[in-house]
Swiss-Prot record:
Origin species: Methanocaldococcus jannaschii (strain ATCC 43067 / DSM 2661 / JAL-1 / JCM 10045 / NBRC 100440)
Matching PANTHER family: DEPHOSPHO-COA KINASE, UPF0200 PROTEIN MJ1399
Protein name: UPF0200 protein MJ1399
Residues where ATP binds: G8, M9, P10, G11, A12, G13, K14, S15
One Pfam family hit: AAA_17
Entry keyword set: ATP-binding, Nucleotide-binding
Domain of life: Archaea
An example molecular function term from Gene Ontology annotations: ATP binding
Classification via Gene3D superfamilies: P-loop containing nucleotide triphosphate hydrolases
Amino acid sequence: MLLIGITGMPGAGKSSAYEIAKKYNLPIVSMGDVVRYETKKRGLELTPENVGNTAIKLREEFGNEAIAVACLKYIEENLKDKEIVIVEGIRSLYEVNYFRKHKPLVLIAIHSSPLTRFERLKKRGREDDSANWEVFVERDLRELGFSIGHAIALADFVVVNEKSFEDCLNQLDNILQEILNNLEKYKKYNFIYETLR
């Protein structure tokens, strides 16, 4: 099995992976859904602060890989017969390393400028999004505190998502074609960066 991880800051366009997954009939697992589920389970409203604090608490309680552990468990229990699984929402190098200790992982970073992301989040209007710039900045800083910058910097592929949704999809489609055309090469892709201790 090959995992294709999607990383990027909030509003960068990670969810566009769902369209590509649909096109290629690939299963997709959202790490953010795991955190939102855990937030609700703890009886908290889905606000940016509550979801962010739940992510922090999960990592404090179960280690920096906590969300990756839950996702991989789900994958192994429900998708073990799949050749490729997309994991959307990788937030840290700890999570990258955890996945790569267990499965080959190709990492795709989706990047957009802060202003572009802020405008998208205002339009998206998900419960844990905010139309307040200060709350947006706090969320960015919290994400960077998880070491998401390390994951983005060490991605195998980068999509710059400043144009249209279709442009983002075309870039993702080209990357997926590269991976599918060289599947055996990427199934050996599991080098680990162990310096974050």
